[in-house]
């Protein structure tokens, strides 16, 4: 079982799609390399196909072992300093204000 932290976002500002994604990958891979996250995927709505008209174009899925690992990742990012923050800022400043977040878990839980 895993916890999936999902983000739906649109990109705005002066950055190419490739740079936006590559910068995001650098940040997320840093968390994977530090064992703060299991894996991630960055996806984009294909040809604008979606049933919800205002659903953001980008979907980022981050997989964690459990809530404790999510907490470790947030604690790692929260100081907003150093190389990791530079990587975070390199794409996050181009995320539009309509960002949405959700936390999912396999069901049923084993609790």
Segments predicted by a language model, with ranges:
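C-terminal structural segments of small proteins and small subunits
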Residues: 84-91
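Short S/T/G/P-rich N-terminal loop/turn motif that feeds into the first structured element of a domain
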Residues: 1-79, 93-111
């Amino acid at each position: 079982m895993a916890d999936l932290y999902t983000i739906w976002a649109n990109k705005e500002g002066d950055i190419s799609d490739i740079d936006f994604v590559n910068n995001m990958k650098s940040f997320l891979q840093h968390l994977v390399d530090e064992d703060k996250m299991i894996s991630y995927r960055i996806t984009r709505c294909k040809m604008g196909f979606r049933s919800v008209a205002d659903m953001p174009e980008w979907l980022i899925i981050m997989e964690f072992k459990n809530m404790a690992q999510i907490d470790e990742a947030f604690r790692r990012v929260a100081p907003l300093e150093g190389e990791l923050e530079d990587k975070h800022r390199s794409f996050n400043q181009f995320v539009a204000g309509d960002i949405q977040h959700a936390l999912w878990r396999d069901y049923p839980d084993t609790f």
